[in-house]
Amino acid sequence: MEQQSYWVQTTDQQRLYVKTWGNANNPVLVLVHGYPDNQEVWEPVIGHLVQDYYIVTYDVRGAGMSSVPRCTRAYALPQLSLDLESVVNSVIPQRSFHLVAHDWGSIQSWESATEPKYRERMLSFTTISGPCLDHAAFWMREQFKQHKPQFFKQLTKSWYIAAFQVPFLAPTVWQFFSPEHWGKVLSRLEGRSDLPLNHHIAADGKHGVALYRANFIPRLTKPRERFAICPVQAIVLEQDQFVSPALIDEMPKWAEDFQRVNVNANHWAILSQPEVIAKEIKRFVQNWRCVEAS
């Protein structure tokens, strides 16, 4: 696939590695990757979308080829939202776009999808396995009061979040992950042995831990009421071993124009079932265009 690459400077002087794919005259999709991935994780999905869309991807700070901030607070959600703004202002200035995000890419993209300044520019948001931390905090409080089994079920899926708060633990563990070792972990989760390898996995895992440390405790202890400023689609992965599908149940409270689609897949469906994920992205975007045209 033909692609071009760019360097974009952020508001705090970090450098983000950005790629664009396809015909610039097509509608724009911005894809944001999760943890411990980099933008290459989207390439299987891009292959099914590039004929119809102009696609923008980037390595989030601390991942792939992008620079690595020295302090944890540089990974806070407001700054990550500014990173997205820097990317779109540089690569697609003054153009509107559809946002699609997975895992931590989705968590950080909720910050933008609930930010009023994007109202005239962000056309839609497709979230995959990454809830808004503020919404999740309200949901967990409600579950603890009224549905404790559901609360503890999600806690068992989120054990790693507590582990990532321990200084030096996660960065040390990631040093032992080779691309092949991580590939075997993904293969067991997704039931496929032909998944592409992440050759940056040790660094991506080590540095990306700061996403958890900078955001989970502040957001879970002091959640904010944040409402979506555009139509939202949640692609719910029914076999997801890290994010409970029940977290999506409350999402209509926060998104006036909301739809949900279930996919029988595990957490990294963008790798194991890229055609299915691409189909749902395309369907949602096309439906938006039909509604807008009418």
Ranges and model annotations:
Residues 256-294:
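Catalytic active-site module of serine/aspartate enzymes centered on a nucleophile-bearing elbow/loop
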Residues 1-7:
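An N-terminal hydrophobic leader/cap segment in hydrolases
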Residues 19-65:
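Conserved HGGG/HGGXW glycine-rich cap/lid loop of the alpha/beta-hydrolase fold
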Residues 21, 235, 262-265:
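Conserved beta-strand termini and adjacent loop/short-helix elements that scaffold enzyme active sites
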Residues 12-14, 25-26:
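Short acidic/polar mixed-charge low-complexity motifs
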Residues 7, 17, 28, 211:
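Conserved beta-strand positions that form and line the central face of beta-propeller blades
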Residues 2, 14-16, 35, 41, ...:
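Flexible "cap/lid" subdomain of the alpha/beta-hydrolase fold that forms the substrate-access gate
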Residues 23-24, 91-95, 288:
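Glycine-rich phosphate-binding loop signature in dinucleotide/nucleotide-binding domains
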